[in-house]
């Protein structure tokens, strides 16, 4: 399993849930050495700083050349292209976010290698929590147990004062947070 934006609130939980549900190997990408270290502390088998080298090269190395079967996409862009290249036949992609495009002022190109999805028989599916209500009770039960026994933990970045909310939002878009960004009022 490869999770992009893995040090964020969603990505960090996705990686831990994948491990809790038996994923053989979980790989995460993040934007600072500290976030990479945090992913390893959370139980990710491998993590890399996407700023250090091309994402595809780092992903291939982290997967030991065996490819990946599942990609949870929080980022889009170069991460999605790298994942498409490294996904094995029959691989699955959950499209949850595209943070690489959130601040873009120009139209962003589609993945240049999207045609790989045909030959590899990939499944790409949009993911919204609200679209998964039928799993809410099961998820709540499992998550409560995982939180109680420490299988899953979470991080929060807390900013004090409503007057600091605009900067907190900008910091969120710039990836300055680890885990959930909260404004305490």
How should each PLM-predicted stretch be described?
Residues 1-53:
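Mid-domain Rossmann-like dinucleotide-binding core that forms the NAD(H)/NADP(H) cofactor-binding site
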Residues 44, 67-68:
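Local beta-strand N-terminus motif with an aromatic residue
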Residues 54-66:
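Short amphipathic alpha-helix with an adjacent loop that forms part of the alpha/beta core around
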Residues 130-185:
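C-terminal hydrophobic helical "lid"/dimerization subdomain
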């Amino acid at each position: 399993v490869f999770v992009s934006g893995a040090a964020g609130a969603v990505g960090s939980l996705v990686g831990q849930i994948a491990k809790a549900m038996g994923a053989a190997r979980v790989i995460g990408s993040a934007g600072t050495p500290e976030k990479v270290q945090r992913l390893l502390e959370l139980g990710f088998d491998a993590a890399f700083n996407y700023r250090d080298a091309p994402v595809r090269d780092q992903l291939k190395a982290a997967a030991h050349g065996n490819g990946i079967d599942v990609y949870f996409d929080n980022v889009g862009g170069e991460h999605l292209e790298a994942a498409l290249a490294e996904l094995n036949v029959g691989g699955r992609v959950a499209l949850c976010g595209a943070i690489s495009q959130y601040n873009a002022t120009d139209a962003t190109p589609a993945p240049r290698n999207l045609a790989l999805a045909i030959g590899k028989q990939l499944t790409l599916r949009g993911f919204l929590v609200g679209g998964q209500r039928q799993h809410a009770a099961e998820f709540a039960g499992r998550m409560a147990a995982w939180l109680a026994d420490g299988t899953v933990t979470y991080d929060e970045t807390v900013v004090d004062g409503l007057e600091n909310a605009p900067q907190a939002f900008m910091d969120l878009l710039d990836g300055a947070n680890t885990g959930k960004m909260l404004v305490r009022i």
